[in-house]
Amino acid sequence: SFTHYVNRFRIEEAIRLLSDPNNETPMKAISAELGFNSISTFYNLFQSSVGMTPSQYRNKVMELQKEQ
């Protein structure tokens, strides 16, 4: 469906933004930038799609960058 397509695009864009270790944009701003009405909707959709919250994902990226 169209909604599924849009949400998949939003999550892919969130992953791209959160994968940049230099991006310190607050989650609330990322959520709003991607068109979510609430940060909880963003967190829930991200977690159901990726298997972790956006914050956990960002922290994991940071840890992996430090190891390199």
Description of each model-found segment:
Residues 48-49, 60:
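Alpha-helical DNA-recognition elements
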Residues 1-34, 60-68:
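Terminal helix-turn-helix DNA-binding modules in bacterial transcription factors
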Residues 25-29, 39-40, 55:
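Residues within helix-turn-helix
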Residues 41-42, 46:
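Short hydrophobic/aromatic patch on the recognition helix
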